């Protein structure tokens, strides 16, 4: 766990959430002994720099591994449809063409929508719009194989419209720690 970046392991594979604000995520993953070639699913909550800039480093490093034959399969990046162009633009402006050319296949940017449920690894993951007034942002609720529930409702106070996703969660990964009604105070 790093800021609001975290990875859930299932067997030898990982589902990662956000990637931090730069290449520091690479050091954190190394320290946590999370191999890049085992991360095949990444969810990006929103466009703020402390959540999205590390995605570019992930694409670069996983792209390098793909080019060297050290990464098998597809790298799935899930985000709301508005972030797809943002990520592609960042990549186009900062990465070599050989990495940008991997976007589409084997690096896939996958748009998700409010209340959409997907099977990711061995988890049932439901994405939801957190109803942010600052920047469009999504969270998720995942049911793990053992029935435990993980909820990541983003980095703003939990909007009452999203309570159903957090209710009953065994693990709640949240960056904001105040009630929605108190958001202007904090």
Predicted regions and their residues:
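Conserved beta-strand hairpin/beta-sheet module of binuclear metal-dependent hydrolase folds
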Residues: 1-32, 136-154, 171
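Active-site neighborhood of phospho(di)ester-bond hydrolases with catalytic His/Asp-centered motifs
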Residues: 17-20, 40-46, 54, 80, ...
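Short, glycine/acidic-enriched loop or turn micro-motifs at the edges of active sites
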Residues: 21, 49, 132, 157-158, ...
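Active-site metal-binding motif and surrounding structural segment of the metallo-beta-lactamase
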Residues: 23-76
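Alpha-helical elements of the RecA-like P-loop NTPase motor core of helicases
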Residues: 26-27, 53, 85-88, 160
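Metallo-beta-lactamase
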Residues: 71-136
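Catalytic core of the metallo-beta-lactamase
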Residues: 110-168
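Cap/insert and terminal regions of metallo-dependent hydrolase folds
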Residues: 157-186
């Amino acid at each position: 766990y790093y800021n609001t970046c975290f990875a859930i392991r299932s067997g030898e594979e990982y589902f990662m959430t956000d990637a931090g604000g730069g290449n520091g995520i690479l050091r954190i993953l190394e320290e946590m002994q999370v191999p890049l070639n085992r991360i095949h699913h990444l969810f990006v909550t929103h466009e703020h720099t402390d959540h999205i800039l590390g995605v570019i480093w992930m694409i670069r490093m996983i792209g390098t591994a793909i080019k060297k034959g050290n990464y098998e399969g597809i790298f799935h990046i899930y985000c709301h449809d508005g972030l797809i162009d943002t990520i592609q633009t960042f990549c186009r402006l900062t990465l070599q063409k050989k990495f940008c050319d991997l976007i589409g296949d084997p690096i896939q940017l996958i748009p998700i929508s409010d209340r959409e449920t997907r099977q990711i690894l061995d988890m049932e993951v439901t994405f939801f719009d957190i109803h942010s007034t600052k920047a469009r942002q999504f969270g998720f609720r995942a049911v793990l194989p053992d029935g435990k529930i993980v909820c990541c409702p983003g980095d703003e106070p939990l909007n009452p419209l999203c309570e159903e996703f957090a209710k009953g969660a065994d693990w709640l990964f949240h960056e904001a720690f105040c009630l929605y009604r108190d958001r202007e105070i904090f």
